[in-house]
Amino acid sequence: MTGGDIPRPLSDIERDVIARLLSVPFPGRDELRAQLPFATVEGRCDCGCVTVNLAVDRAAAPATVLSGAPVSADISDDEFYAGIVLLVDGEGYLCCLEVYSIGDEPVRRLPPVEQINARPQR
């Protein structure tokens, strides 16, 4: 789950997608938002999808969340349906932007944020 361009800063679209996920209220959201400027990409999925592993500088404060997957989203358009989950490690730091497909093909590009319907986990 690494490549020649890893580690690297978040791309604009990765940052925008995470910000969209963090736009819905849930416990720990504000702390996770504050981690975003400290987040970098440290790995990616080998299947070719756009899932990325994240690392956060520990200078940022950890978040207290109710689960390791505090927020998720549906992505849909006329051609496909998929999902996104923002994962948090056991120490309270962003650790993965997981993008999964409901179909056979992996999601190879992040969608426009307008197509992301975020919701907190219950």
Predicted regions and their residues:
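Short, compact, well-ordered microdomains
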Residues: 76-122
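N-terminal domain-onset segments
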Residues: 1-72, 109-122
